[in-house]
Amino acid sequence: MTIQRSVVAVPARLASSRLPDKVLAEIGGKPMIQRVLEQCAKAKGPAAVVLCTDSQRLQQLAKAWGFPVLMTSESCSSGSERIASVADELVARAWGETADQWDQPTHIQRLAATAVINVQGDQPFLEPEVVTAMVDEFNHRDSVPAVVTPVYRLKPDNIHNPAVVKTLLAHDGRALYFSRSAIPHVRDVEPAQWHQHTDYWGHVGMYGFRGDVLAAWDLLPASPLEDLERLEQLRLIEAGHTIATFPVEGTSLSVDTAEQLEQARRMAEA
């Protein structure tokens, strides 16, 4: 089985605990969520870019900008849970169909042959080429992975920043763990010098899901690690799924704090 279709899903809400209404914050004269949707639309490959939200306000704005919207429950606890709740509809859009057209064999085939690219709504400087690369990564391996995500080499000043998610990699590029702490810990060395002893990798907040894996999200057991770190991808790790990674240059700034919002505005003006 190979990936034959792809679709970008952008989960977004207004009730952000750390920075309320952040996706509507203006950056370079545009709301952040509009910048994200427009950057995703520049990627080659995906059949559509779909906003997934519980907000009627965001729904109205996205439609005015020309983007389709799928409404979700207010109770979704993460972006992945939000897009998983409409997985069938997302996959159907990738094929130009509706899910109610499918019989059971077609349903199974469509899910397994579709990549759903989850792009968080707080990445205003997302590079479209990264989205394109994520789709390509599914078919450039010996077997189609369950999940693909990009990583980047961290600069020393971000290694100990809890707002920057770190990724611990195996030799073959599999993600062993994700953390807000610096991993690995370098014993008997001052933390400021850890970068001199090993490479540290940051995680770009994007996930490429095989459709059947995404559709089964609500079947995954509760994850204590996810709750502790507040990192949704740990639910997959703890359940035994393999997350494949690939390196990208630089990083796409995720806006989670007021300081990062100001940084984004400065970048837009530069």
Which residues does each predicted region cover?
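Hydrophobic/aromatic residues located in beta-strands of well-ordered beta-sheets
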Residues: 8, 49-51, 116, 147-148, ...
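Conserved alpha/beta core of the MobA/IspD/sugar-nucleotide pyrophosphorylase nucleotidyltransferase superfamily
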Residues: 194-270
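N-terminal glycine-rich phosphate-binding loop and ensuing alpha1 helix
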Residues: 3-53
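Residues that recognize and position ribonucleotide moieties
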Residues: 17, 117, 124, 167, ...
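Short, high-confidence coil segments that cap the C-terminus of an alpha-helix
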Residues: 46, 111-113, 142-145, 241
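Short phosphate-binding loop-to-helix
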Residues: 50, 56-136
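Conserved core of the sugar-phosphate nucleotidyltransferase
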Residues: 126-220
